[in-house]
């Protein structure tokens, strides 16, 4: 390897150095504006997710009220039949009461599972 001759070495290219204001306007300002838009978008989506979750909870609450009303009506109907028995109707009423109680327990369990599911969804959306 031979030593370099100073005449053979090329002069380095000159790099344009921007003033701080130009550097800020050209490079940093667009990035900052884009980040602001992203943050605003995330805030809007968070609000929509919160409203969706609240809406689902409200729907579930209405469903539970309807189910409770139906179960109470079934119980009341069964009790009316029990109070005025007629022969074989006693046995049938007992069966219906048992079925109504089983259905009420199933519905209550389903309602608890729905509430737990919504809470999980709400927690996952908030994190």
From Swiss-Prot:
Residue ranges annotated as coiled coil are: 87-118
Record flagged with keyword Nucleus: yes
GO MF annotations in UniProt = identical protein binding
Which keywords has UniProt assigned to this entry?
Answer: Coiled coil, Cytoplasm, Nucleus
**What Gene Ontology cellular component terms go with this record?**
nucleus; perinuclear region of cytoplasm
UniProt subcellular location: Nucleus; Cytoplasm, Perinuclear region
Pfam families named among the record's database cross-references: MRFAP1
User: What is this protein called in UniProt?
Assistant: MORF4 family-associated protein 1
Q: Which organism is it from?
A: Pongo abelii
Gene name, please? MRFAP1
């Amino acid at each position: 390897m031979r030593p370099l001759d100073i005449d053979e070495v090329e002069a380095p290219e000159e790099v344009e150095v921007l003033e701080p204001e130009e550097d800020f306007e050209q490079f940093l300002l667009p990035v900052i504006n884009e980040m602001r838009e992203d943050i605003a978008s995330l805030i809007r989506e968070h609000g929509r997710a919160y409203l969706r979750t609240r809406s689902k909870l409200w729907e579930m609450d209405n469903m539970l009220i309807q189910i409770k009303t139906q179960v109470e009506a079934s119980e009341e109907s069964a009790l009316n039949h029990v109070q005025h028995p007629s022969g074989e109707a006693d046995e049938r009423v007992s069966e219906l009461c048992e079925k109504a109680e089983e259905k009420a327990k199933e519905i209550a369990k389903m309602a608890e599972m729905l509430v737990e599911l919504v809470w999980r969804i709400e927690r996952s959306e908030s994190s």
